[in-house]
Curated annotation (Swiss-Prot):
The keyword Membrane applies. One of its GO terms (molecular function) is P-type potassium transmembrane transporter activity. This is Potassium-transporting ATPase potassium-binding subunit. PANTHER family: POTASSIUM-TRANSPORTING ATPASE A CHAIN, POTASSIUM-TRANSPORTING ATPASE POTASSIUM-BINDING SUBUNIT. It is a multi-pass membrane protein. One of its GO terms (cellular component) is plasma membrane. The gene is kdpA. Belongs to the KdpA family. It comes from Variovorax paradoxus (strain S110).
Amino acid sequence: MTSSAWGLLALFLAALLVLAWPVGKFLAALCNERVPRWMQRVEAPLYKIAGTRPEQSMHWLRYAIALLAFNAVGAVFVYALQRLQGWLPLNPAGMGAVSPDSAFNTAVSFVSNTNWQGYAGESAMSYLTQMLGLAVQNFFSAATGIAVAFALIRGFARRGDGKARGLVGNFWADLTRITLWVLVPLSFVLAVFFVSQGVIQNFDAYKTVQTVEATAAGGQTLAMGPVASQEAIKMLGTNGGGFFNANSAHPYENPSALANLLQMIAVFLIPAALCFAFGRVAGDLRQGWAVLAAMTVMFVAAVMVVIPAEQDGNPLFGALGVDQLHGALQSGGNMEGKEVRFGIDASALFAAVTTAASCGAVIAMHDSFTPLGGMVPMVLMQLGEVVFGGVGSGLYGMLIFAMLAVFIAGLMIGRTPEYLGKKIEVREMKLISIAILVTPVLVLAGTAVAVLAGAGKAGIANPGAHGFSEILYALSSAANNNGSAFAGLSANTPFYNGLLGLAMWLGRFAVIVPVLAIAGSLAAKQRLPVTGGTLPTHGPLFVSLLIGTVLLVGLLNYVPALALGPVVEHLVLWK
């Protein structure tokens, strides 16, 4: 890695820690349901309209049913909005109805916090669909993930006695408070900053401008729209779906180096803050630091692979005498598919950030990365999106691995495993197994179906190892709710829209339900005191055990598939 790459990484991590600490403190207060009176007065009319009482905590099953029902209604609404947009207002470009299969895929994508996009926003979606459908789900899907994390944290924190025994909180109160007091204020501040940098925010009709050189088309059409407001929650909510087809590579979405840095910080802000919130609510800040340390170590390791892989360039160019060395006058390395204004360091770091989190935003085409460089984003997703991960989903995913780690440690020393004073028993381990195995089954089975089916093979534009990698990446992205793509795959077809839509829905909610069941089970248990035989879960030894568990359990499932795709491609390229 170059000195500029190290400097960018250090600046990014330092700024992230400084900003995440106070946000984590506020999230802990919300998780503990310590809401000031003035906030309660603002919330009260919403609860009255909804017919719910925020102080009434729910059993995990009731919490899960409310969550699933809310998200199902959201999916139906977004689907209907796309199908009807041709007859609705705020459609200056005259966009017609989205096809049924694409509308289904997009509705599931945004409700599940995946934001996989098989369409180009500027040529498919009206302003109303973008604002009322997609942007609203950016808020609600993010709030849903944080709410599940809150429920699991409460499961650890509650004593297992009294009226709160077995209860995990009120979904409607969590959803309202997270949206009103976390996501909306942060998004407003970030959107104003983006506007100051040059991100557009308007309802103008598309503009036709004359280019410097005359063209047969007579000019260029510039798409407009309310971009800044959607861009903010796109990053803060680890959503990733771009207003434009080029996503954050588009100058109207990401116009400057400073905006680019803030976008990366925004992606990790809430996942990092939730680690601090977890430590505070659990009554031991060291627990939060341990989880954050494990995430950070794996993230830095990924960055240390992807940046040099891109900086080394393409050996086929080297054989032609092309200068690919980094220097004062050029970025060097593999610049295919990258914005010159960002270069290799920022592009590779952005790719690591958005695939470590379940964001999916891009400033470079991952399909144009070197085989090794492209494998890093794929592996970060296949780990289960627990390296920071999505808002909420990253923390509850990592806590699932933490419970598995203490279970393995308990087997090695012959003690009943416990984490934060709660015994990890047969019921929890069955649910943990389900939560961990859902996504590998979806990814590998979906990939097998796609490479066997004629409709799946028809979408491959690059036969061979890279074509297989494109399919594996698409299923990894969908099932792990990331949303980025190796865009060489033609995925906006009925086959892929259906397959990926199913993977996105199950990858989201077939994990959330067992996590909530674990939360309810833990909340019903007494919290045991710490003894001399208790495994410390806050030191370097446990951090190492946790990282090892994530890598062994999360990654080994995919080694044969990776060997058929990026590994083969890398060996062929560098033979």
